[in-house]
Amino acid sequence: MALIGVLANLLILCLSYARTAPDRIIGGLECNQNEHRSLVLLYNSGGFFCSGTLINHEWVLTAAHCNRENIQIKLGVHNIHVPNEDEQIRVPKEKVCCLGTMNCTQWNQDIMLIRLNSSVNYSTHIAPLSLPSNPPSVGSVCRVMGWGTITSPEVTYPEVPHCVNIQILHKELCEAAYPILLGNSNILCAGKLLGDKDSCKGDSGGPLICNGQIQGIVSWGGFPCAQILEPGVYTKVFDYIDWIQDIMAGNANVICPGDNF
């Protein structure tokens, strides 16, 4: 009952604010080319399907449900139809999920590391994103980005990545919207209570960036996207720091963080 009261009060506050707030498209506005140097495009013969984040010369972080056959990774992309001079293409040398490459799952432990077949050269449009030093606090304003649809439920895929600011919300808000999350501690709940800003179809695997660090990985949410009291669900990267660092260091017998999901 207490949670219902909190949700009701928050909704009233947001509705009062909405009278003066302009409408926004899903995904916000076109990203500045300088702000998504770590963002990578995942595609195969079927076309683009996910994003990911470059975290060093050899490794990309993305969502486990983005696992596909014959993945190619394109770095340094802005307009998908107009190549940058410093674009680079890599393929996976190794893919690592919490439950093994053959057991990547869409909802639980939605995180995957891709080791690239050769080292990436940093350049004007290519640079890594830092891993988190601390978890984000509720209320933090963070930025999500990707080439996902900018309309919903109809889909409109842009040629350039879009960026939008959203907030870290209480996990209980996501649990209220999606009861399947009860007991899962390895997620972040982020968005806007009014639902006017959100990640959406095609943004999967991309970063949620807070203070210059990757704090979340786009995982899933309601559809149509950007609905009232239906925030996005993001993999909480901070909970996987030890796992990520152990994998990149080549340590054996790596244990993924457990949960009760």
Curated annotation (Swiss-Prot):
Q: What is its EC number?
A: 3.4.21.-
Q: Which positions form S-S bridges?
A: 31-163, 50-66, 98-256, 142-210, 174-189, 200-225
Single GO cellular component annotation? extracellular region
Q: Which GO terms describe its biological process?
A: proteolysis
What Gene Ontology molecular-function terms does this entry list? Answer: serine-type endopeptidase activity; toxin activity
Keywords annotated in UniProt: Disulfide bond, Glycoprotein, Hemostasis impairing toxin, Hydrolase, Protease, Secreted, Serine protease, Signal, Toxin, Zymogen
Q: Does the keyword Transferase apply?
A: no
Q: Where in the cell is it found?
A: Secreted
Residue positions of the active site: 65 (charge relay system), 110 (charge relay system), 204 (charge relay system)
Grouped into one coarse class, the protein's main location is: secreted
**What does the record say about tissue specificity?**
Expressed by the venom gland.
Propeptide residues are: 21-24
Signal peptide stretch: 1-20
Q: Which residues are glycosylated?
A: 103, 117, 121
Tell me which residues make up the Peptidase S1 domain: 25-249
Alphabetical list of SMART domains matching this protein: Tryp_SPc
For this protein, the record's InterPro entries field holds: Peptidase_S1_PA, Peptidase_S1_PA_chymotrypsin, Peptidase_S1A, Trypsin_dom, TRYPSIN_HIS, TRYPSIN_SER
Question: Which branch of life, at top level?
Answer: Eukaryota
Q: So what family is this one in?
A: Belongs to the peptidase S1 family. Snake venom subfamily.
Q: How does it assemble?
A: Monomer.
The task this protein performs is described as: Snake venom serine protease that may act in the hemostasis system of the prey.
Q: What is this protein called?
A: Snake venom serine protease
Organism of provenance? Philodryas olfersii
Biological classification of the source? Eukaryota, Metazoa, Chordata, Craniata, Vertebrata
